[in-house]
Amino acid sequence: MILSVSVHEDLHALAVQHAVRRRGREFHIVESDGIGGRRALSWRSDGAFGSATVMTADGARVALEEARVLWWRRPRADQTVAAGATSAHERSLVNNDCRGALGGILAASFHGQWISPADATDRAADKVYQLAVARDAGFRVPRTLVSQSRDEVVAFTREVGRTIVKPVVGARGPSLWTRRIDSPETFPASSFEVCPATYQEYIEGRRHIRLNCFGEQMYAALIETHELDWRPDLDVPIRPWRVPHTLHRQVTTVLRRLGLRMGIIDLKLTPQGEPVWLEVNPQGQFLFLEPLTGEPLTEHFADFLTSAEEAEEGEEVPSADSERRDDLDAVTGTTGTGR
């Protein structure tokens, strides 16, 4: 059995579910935003078979002991039904406890393959950390400054020349696109002090690479545009791009060091053809590329999951009293709950 933890009506999860089920495999979606308001979770400490169950989007109750692969796609959404909660504190309690219970139960009772492990996913989502890992693996990375100081930003732009600015993490809601920053000395110092931002040297060129990594398999698209951020306008030349062996090896090294089984990577090619690392999204979007490139990424990803399931079925499933996974906090993601 393959499980996907995601949000209600997530197009990626639904498309992959359809592809996997066509292969005669069992695939269920557990809606991380649909725990509140129904009997969605159950766990007992005695470890008997069936002592850990989750309710799927179809309303079925499945035992985690039967699952072999867990696609950790969108695990930490707020609840769509707050189960009668009215105040902000009550809603926070519902969201935290639903999130914590789901993550904790999975960490304690799921013994198959994570796509990708929760702690690795969290760590790899740190853009500063992943830049350091990519650099150590031999990638060229943009010269980068994370700062709240106008003076530091001014000095940095004078050192590197053309500079872009983007969020360190970002927020839910409208996207904040990458932008040029010119003459930072003309902005008030207080505008820099509100929160840290990421400042990077501008990489010359118009060839962007979107690299979809599913296990050892990689499928790339070449996006040609002069825009800093290609995402707002996809009405540009986009086509499949063959991944060179050297790049494949470097990317594999980065993903292994990050502990990721999959990743969606953004690169930019210099005018000389050198790939420059921009970032990896541990659970990035890929469906939009199918109609633009003709690459059947849904089928490729379904093959990746079913191969992982077959590999797990060939191994002995650990007993219930085997060593529990480390760092449950990385999985539960609870905040401000106390002890």
Where are these predicted regions, by residue range?
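A long amphipathic alpha-helix within ATP-dependent nucleotide-binding catalytic cores
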Residues: 193-196, 201, 229-275, 298-310, ...
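Conserved N-proximal alpha/beta basic substrate-recognition cap immediately N-terminal to
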Residues: 7-22, 28-140
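Phosphate-binding site of ATP-dependent enzymes
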Residues: 20, 158-250
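Extreme N-terminal starter segment of soluble prokaryotic enzymes
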Residues: 1-3
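Loop-centered beta-sheet repeat module
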Residues: 123-176
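A short beta-strand motif that forms the metal-chelation/ATP-contact edge
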Residues: 211-213, 273-288
